[in-house]
Amino acid sequence: MSNIKDKVVIITGASSGIGEAAAKELASKGAKLVLAARREERLQKLQGEIEQSGGTAIYKVTDVTSQAQMEELAAYALKEFGKIDVLVNNAGIMPQAFLFKKMVDEWDQMIDVNIKGVLYAIAAVLPSMREQKSGHIINLSSVAGHNIYPGGTVYCGTKHAVRAISEGLRQEEAMSGTNIRVTNVSPGAVSSELLDTTSDAESKAGLNEFYKIAIDADSIARAITFAIEQPSDVAINEMIIRPTVQVG
């Protein structure tokens, strides 16, 4: 029997890309999905596909930059399923541009989604996980959380922050004996709508060229599944998943 069967899994950014792929993969293993994103029509479609395949999924339209909405999402999961076993903290954006272009609004948005959104989600699920003395928080960082490159300075900063948050949370929960696992997943180039969040034409042209080597989101979904499937005394803390031909 799969270690995933009947686990209650919240996925943010579930309407496309890695979030959508993870939802389908985990549902096929018997998880009960709580899907969160801003685009309701996408969530409805995904829920329908999962249920048509025999899986279980509910959804709630959620903006991760709102702490109140994240708390409501966790409360909804607890109301419907009675527990939260896994959080896949996936929502993120990737605007790229050189600093001198002063894309300040995009900096603010990245910080709100990629850092505050991650923190709000953790804060929303942590109390119930600590109370039940089990849980698994999976944060999506990036290869950009390990490297820095021109044009990606702020994005890299947010993804380095996700890695730091993941490791800090891991240490805190390990020393507290709560049996909460923390996994940081750092994808390389993956086919998704992430490129659409870059408005700067120069940066977008470079990204479009680089992303010709991108792998499918299913590859990351399988890695997430692998981490969840481990026995409760085993924690996969860090995974870097690149296309084989990706250099940096």
What are the residue ranges of the model-derived segments?
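C-terminal helical subdomain
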Residues: 180, 184-185, 203-248
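Residue(s) in the substrate-gating loop at a strand-loop-helix junction
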Residues: 142
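Substrate-binding pocket helix/loop in short-chain dehydrogenase/reductase
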Residues: 98-99, 106-111
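Conserved glycine-rich cofactor-binding loop
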Residues: 8, 15-16
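Active-site helix of classical SDR
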Residues: 122, 158
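The beta1-alpha1 cofactor-binding region of Rossmann-like NAD(H)/NADP(H)-dependent oxidoreductases
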Residues: 40-41, 61-73, 104
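Conserved glycine-rich Rossmann-like NAD(P)H-binding loop of the short-chain dehydrogenase/reductase
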Residues: 29-46
